[in-house]
Design a protein with these regions (language model features):
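Detector for C-terminal structural segments
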Residues: 136-138, 314-319, 323, 424-485, ...
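Aromatic-rich, solvent-exposed beta-strand/loop patch
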Residues: 193-204, 219, 224, 265-284, ...
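Surface-exposed binding/hinge segments that line
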Residues: 211, 245-289, 305-314, 459-473
């Protein structure tokens, strides 16, 4: 789902140069890139706005060897049979016969045994306490990140810091609320029981049931029960962001079996990852929201069940989270070694440039840099040279999705695919990478970049079998030649590409008249590029100037994050930046990205307005693929259709995170597939004392 597409969008687009929806474990759903756009982690989310640069995207991890059984659970047999685990409770009539386990994965086999003591990538002895201060940009006016209205405070959902491309690890739900399952940073689309003690999936996938931990509590001491889970599901589907309705459509009904068991009944053919999606939904306190209108912005700190509570705030300016010493789950295997900071504080700044200066001054402790130019030229200051600030390129092995200039096909100007293709031909990535991004990026060539799901070469026979039913509606070139993008020498001499773009525009019914590109009625082609932060202007203006050479009038408009969110929520734009974040195994987020239902749902991530029979059919094929081979085939076929329909102008990507921090912290030595998870870090008292003293002395 999209817990704030605007920020997601930004993150994406900015990834390379200069936007939760939470998804299945490590899927990287919400959600973006180099200089940046709107995916898949709240509305104006802090770090998200900190800059989208052409550069980043992570994904999940490798599962241990074993039979690829869709939905297989940790501790269960491949057939998922067996009785309830000790203390799990008894299944009532109608939901018996399912294997019981402590974790679940979409494809493959979970790595950890039922009695695992803690995640292998954490430091189980990490000290607790200390403070970390982070930066957010823009402002906020709500503590409800699950609805369209209002701009939510950062830190309520998703990780503490947003990574480029909307990817990253650490709290799929967040730190105030918790979910039934906790995803593993080190496995692909795999999560383990947290609020639940065991999970059961019917052999025929007709239901998924969660047996709850009887000790689960909200921060005010109220017990967390199955009724809270059921109420949350119904409320999110009814009043939450459109993505919830889309992703949860495969549930036919929800029932509670006693106080500690919740059963989700699934429709035939439901999304393969739906059990995981359900397990990663937040669980909200039914009693606390009673009498409150859930569809309205929330101005008071909510009650949660997570490791942190909101201890103080200045609405729109700052918010502080304090670790709850009585947190009920602090000794669970899924919690040990995580959530180590005693206090996490967010200070809000006008934009990314101001936030960077605050970091240099020592007012902010850690920063994820999404602007390539800034990373190359803006981190040469005394604290870096003295070793007080550490600057690191951290590699990840995650799918990076797609980032680009997305075109709103609801607008007449972009309804014609020939026009959209011409926009792609006119974009000189090589010049931008050389002159704007310091050569730090590579071209985005797939909606599943940095993943085996990316389409390459010509369609293989198994892909053709999926594509053939839609052949009449697809470009012939899709079947005849590999997808390519223009490549220049990077010197700005792109006349051949502009000639080709002009030829496409002429085929679309335009012609040049008095140095203007006009249609048959003599109207000049004109449109606006909408941006959420002035940081992105430096990547938009050169593109706009190139388009003016074709006689197109392009206006670059910058609005504040809240207005950007509103405009994109209601699809009131021509072109903007967008990042589609993906994971190793696509989940129901792709329906929110590209389905017909999402095209007409206010606030969805389907900014282009895609409603195409081939896309619709291939989304279904991806979501119902029974094994990795068929998943790969379906995803590659879908990738080809999206590329050849030219819904966006591909920008850039990278497999590194640019992160700088004041040398106050410790972190596990083990490298993560996701690259970076701040939840596993801690304040190192010795380092912090030295660095803080140097900062006070003006270091």
């Amino acid at each position: 789902m999209r817990a704030g597409r605007a920020w997601l969008a930004l993150v994406g687009a900015l990834l390379g140069a200069v936007l939760s929806v939470p998804t299945p474990a490590n899927s990287g759903v919400f959600s973006p890139l180099p200089v940046s756009p709107p995916t898949v982690a709240p509305t104006v989310e802090p770090t998200v706005m900190a800059g989208l640069d052409p550069a980043t995207h992570p994904a999940p991890m490798p599962a241990r060897s074993g039979p690829a059984v869709p939905g297989q659970m940790a501790g269960s047999s491949p057939a998922m049979t067996g009785g309830p685990a000790a203390g799990a409770g008894t299944a009532e009539a109608g939901t018996a016969g399912a294997g019981t386990a402590i974790g679940i994965t979409v494809l493959g086999t979970p790595q950890l045994p039922p009695d695992f003591p803690y995640f292998p990538y954490v430091n189980p002895h990490a000290p607790k306490g200390g403070t970390i201060t982070l930066a957010a940009t823009g402002s906020y006016d709500s503590f409800n990140p699950f609805i369209l209205r209002g701009t939510s405070a950062w830190g309520l959902v998703g990780p503490w810091v947003a990574m480029p491309g909307g990817t990253g690890a650490g709290g799929s739900v967040g730190h105030v609320w918790e979910s039934l399952l906790t995803p593993s940073d080190d496995e692909i689309a795999t999560a383990y029981c947290h609020i639940c003690t065991t999970v059961q999936v019917a052999p025929n996938r007709s239901f998924v049931a969660f047996n709850l931990n009887h000790h689960a509590r909200f921060s005010d001491g109220h017990p967390l029960t199955a009724r809270d889970v059921a109420w949350t599901f119904r409320t999110l589907r009814k009043d939450g962001r459109p993505g919830y309705r889309i992703q949860l459509a495969g549930v036919s009904k929800v029932t509670t079996e006693g106080k500690w068991r919740i059963v989700f009944h699934l429709r035939p053919g439901a999304n393969r990852a739906l059990p995981l999606v359900l397990g990663e939904l937040p669980v909200l306190p039914r009693f606390w929201f009673k009498g409150r209108d859930f569809s309205q912005p929330l101005r008071v700190p909510p009650v949660g069940s997570g490791p942190y509570v909101i201890s103080s705030f200045r609405l729109g300016r700052s918010v502080t989270f304090a670790r709850d010493p009585q947190w009920w789950a602090r000794r669970l295997p899924t919690s040990i070694g995580t959530n180590n900071f005693g206090t996490v504080r967010f200070e809000y700044y006008r934009d990314a440039a101001v936030a960077l200066e605050a970091f240099k001054a020592g007012d902010v402790d850690l920063r994820v840099e999404n602007i390539s130019k800034t990373w190359a030229t803006g981190y040469d200051f005394p604290a870096i040279r003295r070793g007080l600030v550490i600057k690191a390129d951290i590699r990840h092995h995650l799918p990076t999705g797609m980032q680009g200039w997305v075109m709103n096909t609801r607008r007449r100007i972009f309804a014609n695919p020939l026009v959209r293709e011409a926009m792609a031909d006119a974009y000189d990535f090589q010049w931008a990478n050389r002159n704007l991004f310091y050569g730090q990026y590579k071209r985005d060539m797939s909606y599943f970049s940095n993943s085996p799901l990316a389409a390459t070469g010509l369609p293989q026979p198994d892909e053709r079998a999926l594509l053939d039913p839609f052949r009449a509606e697809l470009p012939r070139a899709l079947f005849d030649r590999p997808f390519t993008l223009p490549r220049t020498d990077g010197k700005g001499d792109d006349l051949p590409e502009l000639r080709r773009a002009l030829a496409l525009l002429e085929r679309a019914g335009y012609h040049v008249q008095d140095l203007k590109l006009v249609d048959a009625q003599g109207r000049q082609m004109r449109f606006t590029i909408l941006l959420p932060d002035p940081t992105y202007v430096r990547i938009a203006l050169p593109y706009a100037m190139t388009l003016r050479h074709l006689g197109i009038r392009v206006h670059v408009r910058v609005v504040d994050p809240a207005q950007y969110e509103h405009l994109t929520d209601h699809f009131d734009f021509d072109m903007t930046l967008l990042v589609y974040a993906e994971g190793d195994i696509p989940g129901s987020e792709i329906a929110e990205y590209w389905s017909c239902a999402a095209a007409h749902a206010v606030g969805s991530m389907n900014l282009p307005g895609i409603c195409d029979p081939a896309v619709q059919g291939l989304i279904h094929a991806v979501l119902t693929a029974p094994d990795r081979t068929q998943l790969q085939t379906a995803a590659r076929a879908l990738d080809r259709v999206l590329l050849w329909k030219w819904y966006l102008v591909p920008q850039w990507t990278t497999d590194h995170f640019h992160i700088a921090w004041w040398n106050r912290f410790g972190h596990p030595k083990q490298k993560l597939r996701v690259g970076f998870d701040l939840d596993t870090w801690w304040v190192d008292r010795t380092r912090a004392a030295h660095t803080d003293a140097a900062r006070r002395a003006g270091g």
